[in-house]
Structures are given as C-alpha cells and as structure tokens.
Amino acid sequence: MELPAVNLKVILLGHWLLTTWGCIVFSGSYAWANFTILALGVWAVAQRDSIDAISMFLGGLLATIFLDIVHISIFYPRVSLTDTGRFGVGMAILSLLLKPLSCCFVYHMYRERGGELLVHTGFLGSSQDRSAYQTIDSAEAPADPFAVPEGRSQDARGY
C-alpha cells in the first residue's frame, strides 16, 4: 500500500495549530520542544533537496512523541479544568496522536529525497561494510601513474 502524497507544509500547518492550542494549558518546555521542531520543518520546506533538513525534522518529530507523553502526563491539570483547558489538553493529545502518522509521511519524503535507513548491527563496534575503502596492506598493486598510453610515444608528452 502506497502512502498518499501529503505536502510538508500541510503537516507543519496542522502541527503548528495543534501546538498553539496545546500551549493554552501546557507552556514552557512543551512549547519550546514543539516549536523548535516546527522550525526544523520550516528549514525542510525551505531546502527541498536537503536530506539533512528532513532527517532532522523526522528525528525531532520522533523525539517530541516521547516528550509530549512526558509533558502531558506530568503537567496535566487534575483539578478545576475549564472548557478552555479541556480544549487545550485535547488539542495537545490530538497532536500527539497525529505525530506517528506525520512521521510516516515525513519518512516517505526522506526516502524520496534520497535518504537511506542506515542500521548497522555492530553499533559502537566495527562496521563490516568497507567496500568503498582500500586497506593499506592491499594485495592489489596500484596502477602505474607514469605508464604511457597506447598510441603515444615517450617523447610526445605535452609539458
């Protein structure tokens, strides 16, 4: 099943609205975490071909899923919640529920921009993929840099 094409600007606008409404109740660290990630999203919109921008935005969205769970669970007002407070809490929870879906769409955009999922089994250990590097004690002899191409004589150099 293929994901539908969703514009990154729509994702940003939706999370900006929900975060703004969530800040009615949860301010401080909730606002800093979410608006910082939205700034990374603006960077990803501005640089359409940047893999770094979209990967930072994706990583930030994943981090704010955890942070939002912590913020909502710690700072949830348990007494005398007004209608406005319930609305703000509801929007913060809706934002939290939509973030995994947004992560799927942003990951799809990351793959479209040429990003790859780099998972190494030897985390903090030596990697086994060294195909792009030549070892120092290689058995292959290097090509002779002073070899004369065929069809040209030794004295026909263009110095």
UniProtKB/Swiss-Prot annotation:
Query: A Pfam family for this UniProt protein?
Result: AGTRAP
One Gene Ontology term from the biological process aspect of the record: response to hypoxia
**Which first-to-last residue range defines the signal peptide?**
none
What tissue specificity does the UniProt entry give? Ubiquitous but more abundant in kidney, heart, pancreas and thyroid.
Region called Disordered, residue ranges: 140-159
What terms describe the molecular function in GO for this protein?
angiotensin type II receptor activity; identical protein binding
Ranges facing Extracellular side: 1-23, 77-86
Tell me a GO cellular component. cell cortex
Q: Subunit composition?
A: Interacts with RACK1, and with the C-terminal region of AGTR1.
What name is this protein filed under? Type-1 angiotensin II receptor-associated protein
Q: Name the source organism.
A: Homo sapiens
